[in-house]
Amino acid sequence: MDLSAVRVEEVQNVINAMQKILECPICLELIKEPVSTKCDHIFCKFCMLKLLNQKKGPSQCPLCKNDITKRSLQESTRFSQLVEELLKIICAFQLDTGLQYANSYNFAKKENNSPEHLKDEVSIIQSMGYRNRAKRLLQSEPENPSLQETSPSVQLSNLGTVRTLRTKQRIQPQKKSVYIELGSDSSEDTVNKATYCSVGDQELLQITPQGTSDEISLDSAKKAACEFSETDVTNTEHHQPSNNDLNTTEKRATERHPEKYQGSSVSNLHVEPCGTNTHASSLQHENSSLLLTKDRMNVEKAEFCNKSKQPGLARSQHNRWAGSKETCNDRQTPSTEKKVDLNADPLCERKEWNKQKLPCSENPRDTEDVPWITLNSSIQKVNEWFSRSDELLGSDDSHDGRSESNAKVADVLDVLNEVDEYSGSSEKIDLLASDPHEALICKSERVHSKSVESNIEDKIFGKTYRRKASLPNLSHVTENLIIGAFVTEPQIIQERPLTNKLKRKRRATSGLHPEDFIKKADLAVQKTPEMINQGTNQMEQNGQVMNITNSGHENKTKGDSIQNEKNPNPIESLEKESAFKTKAEPISSSISNMELELNIHNSKAPKKNRLRRKSSTRHIHALELVVSRNLSPPNCTELQIDSCSSSEEIKKKKYNQMPVRHSRNLQLMEDKEPATGAKKSNKPNEQTSKRHDSDTFPELKLTNAPGSFTNCSNTSELKEFVNPSLPREEKEEKLGTVKVSNNAKDPKDLMLSGERVLQTERSVESSSISLVPGTDYGTQESISLLEVSTLGKAKTEPNKCVSQCAAFENPKELIHGCFKDTRNDTEGFKYPLGHEVNHSQETSIEMEESELDTQYLQNTFKVSKRQSFALFSNPGNPEEECATFSAHSRSLKKQSPKVTFECEQKEENQGKNESNIKPVQTANITAGFPVVCQKDKPVDYAKCSIKGGSRFCLSSQFRGNETGLITPNKHGLSQNPYHIPPLFPIKSFVKTKCKKNLLEENSEEHSMSPEREMGNENIPSTVSIISRNNIRENVFKEASSSNINEVGSSTNEVGSSINEVGSSDENIQAELGRSRGPKLNAMLRLGVLQPEVYKQSFPGSNGKHPEIKKQEYEEVLQTVNTDFSPCLISDNLEQPMRSSHASQVCSETPNDLLDDGEIKEDTSFAENDIKESSAVFSKSVQRGELSRSPSPFTHTHLAQGYRRGAKKLESSEENLSSEDEELPCFQHLLFGKVSNIPSQSTRHSTVATECLSKNTEENLLSLKNSLNDYSNQVILVKASQEHHLSEETKCSASLFSSQCSELEDLTANTNTQDRFFIGSSKQMRHQSESQGVGLSDKELVSDDEERGTDLEENNQEEQGVDSNLGEAASGYESETSVSEDCSGLSSQSDILTTQQRDTMQDNLIKLQQEMAELEAVLEQHGSQPSNSYPSIISDSSALEDLRNPEQSTSEKAVLTSQKSSEYPISQNPEGLSADKFEVSADSSTNKNKEPGVERSSPSKCPSLDDRWYMHSCSGSLQNGNYPSQEELIKVVDVEKQQLEESGPHDLTEPSYLPRQDLEGTPYLESGISLFSDDPESDASEDRAPESAHVGSIPSSTSALKVPQLKVAESAQSPAAAQTTNTAGYNAMEESVSREKPELTASTERVNKRMSMVVSGLTPEEFMLVYKFARKHHITLTNLITEETTHVVMKTDAEFVCERTLKYFLGIAGGKWVVSYFWVTQSIKERKMLNEHDFEVRGDVVNGRNHQGPKRARESQDRKIFRGLEICCYGPFTNMPTDQLEWIVQLCGASVVKELSSFTLGTGVHPIVVVQPDAWTEDNGFHAIGQMCEAPVVTREWVLDSVALYQCQELDTYLIPQIPHSHY
């Protein structure tokens, strides 16, 4: 001890005295929630309420007998602060001395038991479906230990069954060991076990009534149920909700049968309280409690370590537990304090429970219950222990630590071995493994207890960094103490202390939920099985996530131990102890089992925690951020420390870099966040850190675990879980259950899953879907899929970081598998499926997975956003996540260049040589580490960065595997860096990310097909499954997953994936999370559906699995299945799938549109982003529908992905003819030619294709994309233009570079251009947001862009151009940062940037001229364009023409139109057909290389080429780079010819015309607005014509496109473009008006520059209006001006509003005073609705239906105050005098400043307006009449007259004037 015994005693006496003073006279415990009576006596609130409730009459104060009533009770906050501080002091003292105060903690424990248990019970009821079972089991447990065994196993669903038996067996023989783990080191425990048991049991019996029996049995359980406790935890969780009494009973029974019951009953009880309390706290205020609990757990952990070190410490720990219990009791009043104690308790309990089970992990929740019970028994036992073994304190500790650790390890190993024996026992293994892990952690902590004490103290005081500093010491101490026995343990200990500190910090930072999250992380880190077990419970609380993070870092540091990251760590330490040599492999097996079990547990836990998670998801997200940050830096430290001794020094070094970054990980998260500019970045960053930690280690983990995990096969279980979970919380449950199943199925996946499950759990909390789908598919292709799915899960959880982690895990695993041949990659990935197939395959899967991770992240963000209206309850967080994702992505992108390149190298190397990959990865990791995640997530990072990096890595890897693709691979590598450039601005970053994802995915698609050839079919199928899972998990992820699926299975999938990724990315950007929720929901469905799709793509590789999945998912998503059936059919035949998809889309389109609308409605305005997210799924608005009925939408999306993938994989040209594959054709062309660069375009193109086939879905996605990715699209468009340039120039490479720089230039140059282009696009986007048009528009834009680019690229030089385009796209994406990470492209970009700037300026002039010509052409063909205008909207082909900048905008418009006009619906057959036909035609034309098309030489197909010409023209117009004048003229001519020549070409022609319009008319703004106004009506009107007259639709589309091109031009030369836009718009308007008055009206409305102000809106609503205004190019101002046209008021459903200044000014000025519902409904319907229907009808003062605003607007020629002279006299409140004067002026009155200035006798009526209540002098205003001969009225006369817009009679408002004599 540091302090002398005397000093310690003195301090203890003082503290005891303070405690007595702060004790409640009734319960004799530290006062909890102190309340003071009138007589100034302080009692516990609970005690007083109990006292007051006992007597009917007036109660008396127990001390002074005065009457007291409930009303007289007052909360004593100062006293509660005293108690809180005292508890902190006690905790600190305990940490310093290892002593515990049984008194206070016993009290706390006791008191907390009842309230906390009750709360927990409620929570558990919500969170766990097994609660009743658990209760029954627990009830029967006291009667029979065997029953207990059975019940835990039942509760755990076989997780605990085997384990329970083993645990019991072990526990009974090794009861002392287990208990020793709890109380002290094994030796000490063994020595004192008997005493403890007897004394403890006796004490427990004594305390039993108070729930101490639970604790006692817990202690005994700790002894006997170390492994058992995990099983029991579930029981306890279930049981606890029932009552503390049950626990007490069980504990009493346990006491009676100390060995038997303590083993089982105690464990159950203890566990149950953990789960229950934890859940309760998570759900209820216990969130705060939990935070405290976590903190306390941390403290306890440290203390427990101390206790482990010293018997005295152990005793102290028990005392502290008692204190913790007391604190828990206090928790209700000082939640933080309780939490602190609870955290300490959880720590202690964790140590005990680590030995027991998940106690610690669950302790955060559990501690609240168990800590008190456990604390009491612990305290008493510790006290006895102290009395018995004070002398043992010093010397026995280290021995005991080691001995116990060894014993524990042996137990754990036994358990693990036993578990390994059974696949069904894997759960038990997980439990046991987690147990050992916890035990190890506990032991480590014990070993470290002294060193940790200060650290913990710091934690207690919230000094994380100090703790961090201490951690290394702890680590060293731990290593010294248990270096031989536990190599992993120190890490765990470090992790725990770090986690503890982090938890504490989190608690301080974020409050309950953050703390919960911290705890989640901590628990997750601590052990996967346990963490997952708890994670289901605690992940909601952040604790698990935190643990995960810690574990990840620790594991990384640990090397081999790292592989046992969560579960692996404990297992590893166990194995290290037992078989240090066989550590890696056995550990991996054990870990695999543990993780499997953990996953299973997790799946179960999610059921329990689902509600909790849902409720605390958002909070958890916030916490997550904190956790990750806090956790990350400490983890880094840990990593560094542990790394030194880690067997994986290389990894460690990488991580050391990462630790710096990791320690910066919090910073990194923050940095990334700032860089990204996304708030959510933090969480992703944290998750990234986690991912990094996990990822580095996960590889090890995965590598080690795969073989062992292979034995676990729970596919059917998985499926079962998945199917049930889908209905339940499709995402969450599936996540948990599927994940478990997946884990069971594949060792590696299990490992990953275990790691990710925790993360995913967190993620699941944010977007539950993510994990589930991944897991689900993991079952089929367990390893790869699970990894991907786990990745997805992790990704979902961190959404970005997790994605990285997952991505990195896969790549790293693969690489590390190769890297450290100790666990061969084959061994490491001993998946029954893909990983074993090929390391390169694995790598590609890894890459794909990382891509999936990124997509998952993006999807998760979208899902989260969508969650708001969808299944999940994290709409806000998802949004943040979305932002975070982009931020993270951006950060990743920044880092990504390196990482991506590394990844590609790695992947390539892996594909070519696994051994090579090892060094490459090491190098890459090292190089990438500066990027924090680079090593961890080179793939994921790249993927995250743009999905291009990782995707590219994948594709490059595939290419590396395949000679044909190697060049693109190399291209991809350099492109990866290009993708990295997307570091540039956040917006660009997101866009870049999207594009990169597209490029990457295209590239991936490209490479995937080779991958398949290479025998990656399994992996692809795994990827496919994963991607399905991912899709299900996240829409964005779905794209990625689709991509992966495509890679593995079919290009279609990749295409869809890319499409979705692009959309998703864009959506994420646009929505940054809102769409995520819906998208995730859709994704879930999609994921469900995707198995079938997966199957399709899987047929060759894993047909059976897909079938199984298919069956499974068909059940879950029959609709989707139905939709998916075609996909499945076209699995092998991706083309057929696309066709079916097209037909599906055709049939689905109306539904989709409707669904989109529904989704939007569901999304509502608050969830506008979600709506946009829905738009992401817009192909069939089934997206939202998917959330509900995944099948159609999922299928659509999947089909979309597959279709696209099919195009990609299948020879693009072959697929070109297919209607459904029109876009895929483009995509394929792009992909085929330039799999890397076209990837972006292709992705967009695929998006376009998908949009065409599932236009609504894609429209939604596009809408979102257009919102967030509009700039991306613009960039894409620019890239496309660049591509056009390159195509036209036939200089794909150099031109591309030029284009790249030009793109950059355009980006920089066209920031305005982007603004306009984006603006128009945004307008459409906004409309899309308001109407869903924008998204589709954007999607269309990106689609067209991609398509056009793809066509051009494919025609020109598919690979070269495509690659160049990809580069350009990536460069473009990075826009300003093109040069940053463009490796080769970078310099080119820079050079070309200058050149392109000059060229662009020249081209801008040319474009303006050409636009004028185009305008003329448009005017000539005005009717056609206007006729086609809706067509344009719905004509993806036309959009394709606009594919370049113009295309992007027009694509958006087209998509919007498609959505609006139900392009997928009515035009889906034809629109889709037309689109596809056009694509087909384009493809065929491309192939045919019509001369007309050849005009934009890159394009080779007549119709498509014409459109492409339009593209090219628009591109040149927009970029100014291309020979725009001549080309445009040519295009115009071609368009004319085509329009005149052919209907199908008409489609193309219209696209030309629109292009002309775009070029000739800056009609984009108006076009978009027009488009948005008109798209639906237009589309609906033209729907039949569109389908019947494809040409007409394209015309409309082209008209739309033209404005967009114009917008692009505007972006380049804003003024000219705007002018042209106006002119073009007018021309378009004329044609439109001819054909569509409605369109014309909307056009006119758009034509008239709109300006709006808002009044009475919340910030969220204002942001929605802002987006709406941006979409429709409406000026949004804060103050009302003369230019203002609209005043948006917050109203109720009847359009009744409050009266505000802007309300009066709007009426007085004759503005549109409309309800906020106008904005929301417009966003929902993706078009600007007529304001008439939303005009404010009344206000709360003047009547609910006085129609004042309408009257004012319609009678501006009849001013109500005409002929009046009004003097606003005196002070006015709530309204400046000048504003009041302005109001009366606007109403026709002449304003007089002074009373003396009235003009008399001129026929003007003077009126004086005053506000009597504003006058300080009571009667001052009464004398005004003395100064002038004018009536004096109140201000209400003005306000009422204005509001009603009827001059009111003065009589009512006259102020009586008092004669002057009265004064």
Swiss-Prot record:
Q: Which domain of life is it from?
A: Eukaryota
Q: Where in this protein does the record say N-acetylmethionine is found?
A: 1
GO BP, sorted A to Z: chordate embryonic development; double-strand break repair via homologous recombination; fatty acid biosynthetic process; mitotic G2 DNA damage checkpoint signaling; negative regulation of fatty acid biosynthetic process; positive regulation of DNA-templated transcription; positive regulation of transcription by RNA polymerase II; protein autoubiquitination
PROSITE patterns linked: BRCT, ZF_RING_1, ZF_RING_2
One GO molecular function term? transcription coactivator activity
Q: Which residues form the BRCT domain?
A: 1642-1736, 1756-1855
Q: Where is the composition biased (Basic and acidic residues)?
A: 248-260
Look up the record and name the pathway of this protein. Answer: Protein modification; protein ubiquitination
| Compositional bias (Acidic residues) | 1342-1360
| Region annotated Interaction with PALB2, chain positions | 1397-1424
What keywords are annotated for this sequence in UniProt? Acetylation, Activator, Cell cycle, Chromosome, Cytoplasm, DNA damage, DNA recombination, DNA repair, DNA-binding, Fatty acid biosynthesis, Fatty acid metabolism, Isopeptide bond, Lipid biosynthesis, Lipid metabolism, Metal-binding, Nucleus, Phosphoprotein, Repeat, Transcription, Transcription regulation, Transferase, Tumor suppressor, Ubl conjugation, Ubl conjugation pathway, Zinc, Zinc-finger
Amino acid composition bias (Polar residues), ranges on this chain? 705-716, 1373-1394, 1445-1470, 1610-1624
Q: Where do the segments described as Disordered lie?
A: 231-267, 306-338, 650-735, 1045-1066, 1181-1216, 1322-1394, 1440-1504, 1540-1597, 1610-1642
Q: Which residues carry this modification: Phosphoserine?
A: 114, 395, 398, 423, 434, 551, 694, 708, 725, 753, 840, 988, 1009, 1143, 1189, 1191, 1211, 1217-1218, 1280, 1328, 1336, 1342, 1387, 1423, 1457, 1524, 1542
Residues recorded as bearing Phosphothreonine in the entry: 1394
| Annotated domain remarks | The BRCT domains recognize and bind phosphorylated pSXXF motif on proteins. The interaction with the phosphorylated pSXXF motif of ABRAXAS1, recruits BRCA1 at DNA damage sites. The RING-type zinc finger domain interacts with BAP1.
Q: Cite the PANTHER family for this sequence.
A: BREAST CANCER TYPE 1 SUSCEPTIBILITY PROTEIN, BREAST CANCER TYPE 1 SUSCEPTIBILITY PROTEIN BRCA1
Record text on subunit structure and interactions? Heterodimer with BARD1. Part of the BRCA1-associated genome surveillance complex (BASC), which contains BRCA1, MSH2, MSH6, MLH1, ATM, BLM, PMS2 and the MRE11-RAD50-NBN protein (MRN) complex. This association could be a dynamic process changing throughout the cell cycle and within subnuclear domains. Component of the BRCA1-A complex, at least composed of BRCA1, BARD1, UIMC1/RAP80, ABRAXAS1, BRCC3/BRCC36, BABAM2 and BABAM1/NBA1. Interacts (via the BRCT domains) with ABRAXAS1 (phosphorylated form); this is important for recruitment to sites of DNA damage.
Q: What is this protein called?
A: Breast cancer type 1 susceptibility protein homolog
Give the taxonomic lineage as stored in the record: Eukaryota, Metazoa, Chordata, Craniata, Vertebrata
Gene encoding it? BRCA1
